[in-house]
Amino acid sequence: PLCWFNRQPSSSATGELDKDALNFNGNTYYVGFDANQGAELQGQMVLDYIKKNADTIDRNGDGVIGYVLAIGDIGHNDSIARTRGVRSALGTGVDADGGVDSTPAGTNVDGKAKVVQDATLDVDGKTYTIRELASQEMKNSAGATWDAATAGNAIGTWTASFGDQIDVVVSNNDGMGMSMFNAWAKDNKVP
């Protein structure tokens, strides 16, 4: 038997399921969860939180709800799905090859990055712009991805660049998210 555990066999470029690997023989199994379903839930939870707290979440009152995104591994199907899920739910996703682009945006202070777009959200008669201010793969100097320490450093860089424009912090996994929360978001009361 062949057992794929916690990572679906997938293309490192697109994140699409490798059906040949998954169906290698009659005793091939995948043990894990549906990455796309989890991604949709994550994106919807972020959107629901923004809608519920729209009157207080825009910290500087500029009408732009800015978020930063810690991307785990640009070639990992879970990371690709989670990035796409958040961008789809928030309306900031841009189509690339029939799916939402999961490429890191780098910095996007003016909303003109090619891999994301500004979105609008109407809540109780008020229109907000939703903007992905920055995103990057959390890869350390040794090449390890999903790196919590790199995420903690990234939030420091992002806050120095964007300050009170950051209204929401989003992460592809809990370790990176906790690092950003402990390094900055908790003290600044940013979800």
Please provide the spans of the model-predicted regions.
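A residue-level marker of the well-folded mature domains of exported/periplasmic proteins
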Residues: 1-191
